[in-house]
Amino acid sequence: MLTLFAVGFVAMARHVTTTGAFYGFISQGLGQVWGMAAGLVATLAYVVFEGSLIGVFSYFTQSTLDSWWGIKPNWFLLAVIGIVLIALFGHYDINIAAAFLGVCLVAEVLLLAAMAFTVLFHGGGDDGLIAGAINPVNAFKDLAAGGNMPGSSASLGASIDGTAVAAGSAAIGVFFAFWSWVGFETTAVYGEESRDPKRIVPPATMIAVVGLGIFYTFVSWMAVSGTGAKQSIETSAGSNPVDLMKGTFDQYLGHPSTYAFDFLIVTGSFACALAFHNAASRYIYALGRELPAFQNNLGATHKVHASPHVASATQSLITLVITILFWAKMGNDVVQAAYIYEYGVLAVLGTMAILLVQALCSIAVIWYFQVKKVHPGNIVTTGIIPALGAIGMLYVCYLLFSNLSFAGGAASGSLLYKLIPYIVGATALIGLLGCLYIKSRDPALYQRIGRTVLEDAHERD
């Protein structure tokens, strides 16, 4: 489904290069009003994604320090340290952050590959290589209460009655799959900062979707196969699902490998928070540079580092405020405050927002190539495939809406969680009404909305 979306997305990226990727693409395809609405919703998503990852970074860091040395620093202190370090990365040249992210990615891929191929060479665990774990059809089937994992004879038996796992499991499984892939589309965000964006961005996007998608599917398959069907379900439904992967490392690579796993899950969560920080700050910058009141601050870049330093500092401040609010409300319990609420609630909020923007972007691709005919476009790659992508995204949104209470787990009863659809809707409405107001008061400014692109002159018409 994401590949279908990516086909249309990269078709647009070959012609339009802009820091506010969704904002610019949708403005070019569907007009400024929809572009502004999408820009604000996308910004909301990336802003809360950093807060979400800061929460889980704090959780994993405290857990690792406790496991290694028996110390448990306050999660809020760890969160502040993470926010400050990310703020420093965001202030300087993007190449510094890119180098750090690259090192983290390579290290994680190598470690995961070592585990996965070891399991493969062993032929899996007691249940062998479980084919049902990678059957895409099973992603849309609920796990039967007390039943079997598809493709395996292993039963849950009495250890899990199945109701908690079965209820909405397909919908939530698909949702978390999308949450795991969020961020691949940010390749286009860095187009203006790359040397040859029209050559680099399209393949980078497809590699992120297809290449890493195949790799992570393989790794997940090996983790499930190595652990066994029954144990995999029990562990995944337990209080610490990460133990599924960590236990596989312990069993097949030896206990010392779990230390590397612990370290890389801390650096990995930090790297994800950094990546979302960079995306959020560039969306804030893209919106700011087109609005006169913000052009000299949010819309400015650093004279030496060429980074959107004010937008970056603003994003760091927003994340700090979000974290303070969760700490003030939930206290020092790292599981409740950092993991269940800051990480979990904000992840659902951001994913819902970004899914809607992706669906709208697919429609914008069709409009840009097939209706407005700004550029000649293949009917398959800029018409049929984006249409299928949009339908798929909207279907996932429907699944999420239909199973929203299940997705939130222990946090689903909170007021913030119940307000998620309204927060997304209100953000979009502010964008729509704000743009219409600008259109009525300043037509010249309205014409520039979403049109700041690194492109030929006709893209700005």
Question: Which role does the model predict for each range below?
Answer:
Residues G24-F25, G31, S63-S67, A144, ...:
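TM-loop-TM module centered on a large, flexible mid-protein loop between adjacent transmembrane helices
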Residues W75-N138, F178, V182, A204-L212, ...:
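Membrane-interface loop-to-helix entry segments
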